[in-house]
């Protein structure tokens, strides 16, 4: 069994503001290609969080890949109870829809948000309950994933825990490949 934690930037950090944004199409294309390789190499659990951005897009891509790879399991772990409860109705509905579709979901802390320790406990849970991590993150462009990046690097100093970064160069290569396939008449919808 191989369990992959995948996280990364929030949607606003990537300037993606809508499901029809061309940047989102490229990100999902890159995630699909990457996760397909991971599945074919033995990953059977894709574990992500519920944050708006890479985490929710990862869950969406994982659910789509289950049609081709029914053995794949998708889990969403949330840092605390009532996660997303302060979001607008549309974002709350998107989260609830994803939670209803994944194979497993649970909060690491059942309590609503109380303090930053819950976020640290969430990170610790994720690294100790997965076999590897992938971050859509570029260390030259810090953001929210910096905390996960630092924790994973420290954890991997004392544990066999591989980290893969999907950085902006990787995303640019994916954008080029996506554009080339579109120009050749390949339909991604």
Swiss-Prot record:
Pfam families: YpsA. Gene3D superfamilies: 3.40.50.450. InterPro entries: YspA (IPR010697). HAMAP family: UPF0398. Belongs to the UPF0398 family. This is UPF0398 protein lp_1753. It comes from Lactiplantibacillus plantarum (strain ATCC BAA-793 / NCIMB 8826 / WCFS1) (Lactobacillus plantarum). The lineage of its organism: Bacteria, Bacillati, Bacillota, Bacilli, Lactobacillales.
